């Protein structure tokens, strides 16, 4: 094109870029992208449990196509991130901000996490017409509200010192996403998988009509293997071990049955790595 000039070079605001090209951040604009939004926020709460804080996560379906995710972990620290901007606001509204950087140097607030790029929650915020985040700790509840990634308000309430955790609520924006109705079945499947990967962590799903369902695993991957093999037609007793050294942990469950096909599932920091050829090859050897 002969008319390609300097004025053709544009610069988009961070949240404007996410809204214009959501696929780069959440994978797609369809049901899979919406499910990924839920996974991003759920993973933040799971990371609290993996770092020794909290033992329950509540997922509630709300009216007007909303969903909330609440944990009883440590809560995001109170304080001022920059003049006029709280730490809570920054975690969901300031690019490249978070508490999971530098895990390997000891300067992070987390020893392990499913993500550490400071993007997930902000991407969900950007594609939401309404986004609310709350942190509860040290006798104080902070609440921030956004719309389409833009900060709307901040307020504080005094609470009991024993209450801790993080709460996030979002309503997907139909102007950005092609699908804004949550797939309850898909979310339950995702939560069930997480319950096997995080033994000892209880998940409670509350539907809009008030009915609830709990997901909890005491034996982790051992329970998962039995779930995947409901007939329990094992040729020999399954092998299971869970070992830790320093900040590293390895959990393995292996069982053989009389079927002709195999099921292999591999995870790293709760992220499904089954499609990795290198992992699969080393596993089979």
Question: For each of these PLM feature ranges, what is it?
Answer:
Residues 7, 18, 28, 64, ...:
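Generic signature of intrinsically disordered, low-complexity segments enriched in small/polar residues
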Residues 185, 192-194, 200, 204-285:
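GHKL/Histidine-kinase-like ATPase module
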Residues 56, 120-121, 190-192, 239-241:
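Generic recognition of flexible, low-complexity loop/linker segments
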Residues 83-84, 146-151, 183, 216-224:
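A short, sequence-level motif marking secondary-structure junctions
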């Amino acid at each position: 094109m002969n008319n390609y000039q300097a004025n053709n070079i544009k610069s988009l605001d961070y949240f404007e870029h996410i809204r214009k090209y959501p696929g780069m951040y959440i994978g797609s604009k369809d049901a899979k992208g919406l499910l990924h939004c839920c996974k991003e926020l759920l993973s933040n709460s799971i990371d609290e449990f993996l770092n020794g804080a909290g033992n329950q996560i509540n997922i509630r379906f709300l009216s007007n196509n909303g969903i909330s995710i609440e944990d009883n972990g440590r809560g995001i620290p109170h304080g001022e991130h920059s003049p006029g901007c709280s730490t809570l606001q920054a975690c969901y509204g300031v690019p490249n901000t978070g508490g999971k950087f530098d895990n390997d140097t000891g300067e992070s607030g987390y020893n392990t996490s499913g993500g550490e790029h400071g993007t997930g929650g902000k991407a969900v915020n950007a594609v939401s017409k309404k986004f609310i985040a709350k942190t509860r700790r040290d006798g104080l509840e902070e609440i921030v509200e956004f719309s389409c990634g833009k900060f709307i308000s901040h307020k504080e309430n005094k609470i009991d010192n024993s209450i801790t955790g993080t709460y996030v609520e979002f309503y997907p924006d139909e102007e950005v996403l092609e699908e804004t109705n949550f797939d309850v079945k898909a979310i339950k499947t995702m939560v069930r998988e997480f319950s096997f990967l995080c033994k000892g962590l209880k998940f409670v799903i509350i539907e809009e009509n008030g009915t609830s369902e709990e997901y909890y695993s005491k034996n982790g991957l051992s329970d998962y293997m039995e779930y995947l093999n409901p007939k329990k037609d094992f040729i020999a007793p399954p092998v299971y071990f869970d070992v830790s050294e320093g900040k590293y942990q390895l959990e393995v469950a292996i069982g053989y049955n009389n079927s002709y096909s195999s099921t292999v599932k591999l995870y790293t920091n709760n992220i499904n790595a089954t499609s990795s050829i290198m992992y699969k090859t080393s596993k089979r050897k």
